């Protein structure tokens, strides 16, 4: 069976996108860059000091990568001024802007903002906030997006559930305590993201510890309210809740717990009530079910600026870059 990574990589190859990788002090970034270039998935911009990059790379073939050093880049003043204009209402000075633009992640995100690259992948050596803060400050949310959020593509080997074992988990990386409205909006955009990346019809489960009233509390009431709002926002998308995980994916359990549900027993998009649940769930799937986990990938930003887990492999970075290419192409339309 062709894996999700293989499918998304083949799609990315046809798109001719350029992705910036700012964590050039981490060997995994350079290993991933070499693989991406060898496979023809994307053009790569490595942000950092050229001598340091080449010393760390050793025998890796990065000859096709463009290396951009924020300290010597000919457009650095343009970048500094652009950031100053974006953030001067917050009280920053040009000196502050110059210091911030010396940060490789901030610099890479500004490259995306100014159209010099199509997206950014970072997070192997930084916390999620170090990647997502520049994204929110510089590229901001996309037109029409209620909020930015983050998801994981989870691909479980030898799994009969979901879309041939592939699922989308959201929010698993960004919105800590979403409101009822936030969860509803995350559900709708996640369905559209799943369709874009996995190329299958989304079936969205609003997850809970309860199925269809089996328990009642403020927590279940919030999930029910989010479900109703999401259904109103996107009546053409199959969204249902509240559902426990077994009812969401196992047909026999669904028939017993949620008969007549358009989603139960066949869900492929999992919407969690908060970041605690979403993040715990993805790591359980990754570590115990040996699932491939790609993310946290952002949605709702004006440009694709994507995060990584600090425990990621070089192949995880390759996957995130391929996803970023597909997202960028979709935003071009």
Curated annotation (Swiss-Prot):
GO biological process: acetyl-CoA biosynthetic process
An MF annotation (GO) of this entry: phosphate acetyltransferase activity
Main location: membrane
InterPro entries in the record: P_Ac_Bu_trans, P_AcTrfase, P_AcTrfase_dom1, P_AcTrfase_dom2, Phos_Acetyltrans/Butyryltrans, PTA_PTB
Enzyme class of the recorded protein, top EC level: transferase
Transferase recorded as keyword: yes
EC number, as in UniProt: 2.3.1.8
One Gene Ontology cellular component: plasma membrane
Catalytic reaction(s) noted: acetyl-CoA + phosphate = acetyl phosphate + CoA
SUPFAM superfamilies: Isocitrate/Isopropylmalate dehydrogenase-like
Keywords assigned: Acyltransferase, Cell membrane, Membrane, Transferase
Pathway participation: Metabolic intermediate biosynthesis; acetyl-CoA biosynthesis; acetyl-CoA from acetate: step 2/2
Keyword Hydrolase listed: no
Classification via NCBIfam families: PRK09653.1, pta
Record family assignment: Belongs to the phosphate acetyltransferase and butyryltransferase family.
Oligomeric and partner information: Homodimer.
UniProt name for this protein: Phosphate acetyltransferase
Organism: Methanosarcina thermophila
């Amino acid at each position: 069976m062709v894996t999700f990574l293989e499918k998304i990589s083949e799609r990315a190859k046809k798109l001719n996108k350029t992705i910036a990788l700012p964590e050039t002090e981490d060997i995994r970034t350079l290993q991933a860059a070499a693989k991406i270039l060898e496979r023809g998935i994307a053009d790569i911009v490595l942000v950092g000091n050229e001598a340091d990059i080449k010393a760390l790379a050793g025998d890796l073939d990065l000859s096709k990568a463009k290396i951009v050093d924020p300290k010597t880049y000919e457009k650095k003043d343009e970048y500094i001024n652009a950031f100053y204009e974006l953030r001067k209402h917050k009280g920053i000075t040009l000196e502050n802007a110059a210091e911030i633009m010396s940060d490789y992640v901030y610099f890479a995100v500004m490259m995306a903002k100014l159209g010099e690259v199509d997206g950014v992948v970072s997070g192997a050596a930084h916390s999620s906030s170090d990647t997502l803060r520049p994204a929110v400050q510089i590229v901001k949310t996309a037109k029409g997006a209620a909020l930015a959020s983050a998801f994981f593509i989870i691909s479980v080997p030898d799994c009969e559930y979901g879309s041939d074992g592939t699922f989308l988990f959201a929010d698993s990386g960004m919105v800590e305590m979403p409101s009822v409205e936030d969860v509803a909006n995350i559900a709708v955009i996640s369905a559209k993201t799943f369709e874009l990346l996995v190329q299958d019809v989304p079936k969205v489960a609003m997850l809970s510890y309860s199925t269809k009233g089996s328990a009642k509390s403020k927590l279940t009431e919030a999930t029910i309210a989010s479900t109703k709002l999401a259904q109103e926002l996107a009546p053409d998308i199959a969204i249902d809740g509240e559902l426990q995980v077994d009812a969401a994916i196992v047909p026999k359990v669904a028939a017993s717990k949620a008969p007549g549900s358009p989603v139960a027993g066949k869900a492929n998009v999992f919407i969690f009530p908060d970041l605690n649940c979403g993040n715990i769930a993805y790591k359980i799937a990754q570590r115990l079910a040996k699932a491939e986990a790609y993310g946290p990938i952002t949605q709702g930003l004006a440009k694709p600026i994507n995060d990584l887990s600090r425990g990621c492999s070089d192949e995880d970075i390759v996957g995130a870059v391929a996803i970023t290419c597909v997202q960028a192409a979709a935003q071009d339309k």
